[in-house]
Amino acid sequence: DALIGTLRDALGSEWSNTLVMVATEFGRTVAFNGTGGTDHGTASAAMLFSGALANGGNIVADWPGMKPSQLYEGRDLKPTMRFEQFASDALARHYALDPVKTRASLFPDFA
């Protein structure tokens, strides 16, 4: 909270023109492995920070659940959205761009 608050305060009125995306390139398994850690998994988490988010302060997600029957291949969180969709849709909404053209420009193999 302090990091984002400091960034917001430093940017002042430009905070509403700023979009910060945080994402990882891989998730983690739900279950612990033999050494008490977790292995690389399938689904991950991503966050947006901005002064202009329509749902600011809320968690917006399609939560698949963590019951064994809800896991991907019985061990990973089930993906509900590709990163390419998350990133291109966030940029398109924030900067009032056409989402189809934005996705095609940023991720031509995904469009």
Where do the model's predicted regions map?
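Feature marks hydrolase-like catalytic cores characterized by long aromatic- and Gly/Pro-rich stretches
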Residues: 1-111
